[in-house]
Amino acid sequence: SGALGVQLTISRPVQRAVEAVAASTMTSGCILVLDTATAAVRASVSVPCYDPENLADSLQAENSPFLNRALQSYAVGSVFKPVLAAAALEAGLQPVFECTGAVVVDGQIFRCAGGVPHGQVDLPAALEKSCNGYFIRLGQQLGAESLLDAAKDFGFGQSLPLAEGFAAEAGQLPTPQELAQSGQLANFSFGQGSLLAAPMQVAAMFNTIAADGVYRSPYVLQATLDETTGQPVETLSHPRGRRVISAQNAALLRAMLVQVVQQGTAQDAAGRSGGAGGKTGTAQTGQFTPEGTERCNLWFAGFWPAEKPRYTIVVLQDGAVHTAYSGAAIFAQVCNALEAAG
């Protein structure tokens, strides 16, 4: 038989469509599209991409075009909140808290966006409004051990192999010792502190919610090919999924994330049709421009369409200061492009 080539899971029309969206909306970041049913990677776009005609310039460019941003670790922010929501649903908890706009933990003040009080908040409303105070108190109620367990169940803190010799970074989870400090537990509860994750890990987490609570590890190799004939020689097998949350709780969580898009912080994520579910995130990086403005990682992660999701999508704009488009608006453009691609 001839030499072996490989067939990737990347769909050419989807990849091209997503590349076009990325080129017109972001200067630095990435967009990922997974097939919800299998977790196969259908598109992975990292911006800026390097210029193959001029590698020397690309190597010296300040915007690091050689980084595959989908596989690098970043501060996560509020896109982590569904992990707490899932842990709460699995524990049979749906508490109601009064949000005053700020929570004091261990002498530290943690504010909601703009310090706006949300009043009486239950779990769906906390996701919809992205209420930090609610998730801090939910984290206290769940406790450090069950939060860490939930994060690990969803694939955080461990390297994510996509193919032989090709993996997403493990990122970082806080240690139990760190989380023994109530301030650190509060930070972790809304996706800040020492938590780091790759966009591919965030995609796998949201895919679990979209796929009825079953975690499947994303992959990029579909089959080996006979290079002479171009025919598949062997379809590569992938580990079976493992259940992380019940199908019922996954459906409840999906409904909450659809509500976030319908009437919450992510209303510009709604594409032309089919509805969607998802979550915004703004993560502080601790890095500042010369003018003193903090650079943030702006996230949007979700699934499309709302009923029977076909695709799980993650958008990250890294180190952003002023952006022309929100992550949610870019997500909506991706949904429209997926619809057009068929």
Predicted regions and their residues:
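Beta-lactam-recognizing serine transpeptidase/beta-lactamase-like catalytic domain environment
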Residues: 35-78, 83-317
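Periplasmic/cell-envelope proteins involved in peptidoglycan metabolism and beta-lactam response
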Residues: 1-56, 95, 145-153, 270-271, ...
